Amino acid sequence: AGRAVYREANLYRAMEQLSHKNYKQVVKSVETSKEWPENLGVGKPYDNMIDNRLEDYLEAKAAAGQGDSRKTSALLAAVADYTISRSHFESGNLLSALALRESGKVQEADHMVAAWSTDFPENRVVQWCTAIYRGEKEKAVGMLQSRNDQTNTTPWEASFRDSNFDLIVRLFST
């Protein structure tokens, strides 16, 4: 839990700095969020097991703000090329779709988003991500307001927790 809080705090700081167009501080906070300090109780997993799409997406936004198109393209490509799980949906998939669209691969991004609704028709996170992708901010806000409503699931049915969702909600609510 310690490492997760450390990462989230640094990413929230990066988002705050991004809203103030303080791009150097965004990069610094993102780099810090990628660290795995030993005293936070968990060891670093293998690199291929780490989902850095949010960090890379924030860093791409900072690079774009600094006018570094080469770095922006490389970071967006890293976000877009992340291997997406077919067994469950992660809100980071929204970042992959946006990275594709921002890289000029609009059809591929649109196809990805359309597949979400087919593969996960009842998933509220999918519905929220689709609304954000399509620019339907009011619809997305309405979905968040009903987010804490009781659902008819038991604890053992809700086995997957999307640890990036709150961070991604924050990114698109600023």
Language-model features and meaning:
Residues 1-4, 31-50, 77-88, 114-122, ...:
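Solenoid-like repeat scaffolds
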Residues 5, 11-12, 51-58, 93-98, ...:
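"A position-specific structural signal for the A-helix of alpha-solenoid helical repeats
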Residues 6, 20, 52, 85-101, ...:
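Eukaryotic tandem repeat interaction scaffolds
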Residues 13, 17, 62-63:
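TPR/Sel1-like alpha-solenoid repeat signature
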Residues 20, 66, 103, 134-135:
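Structural motif corresponding to the intra-repeat A-B loop/turn of tetratricopeptide repeats
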Residues 112-174:
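Terminal, low-structured helical/coil segments at or just beyond the last alpha-helical repeat
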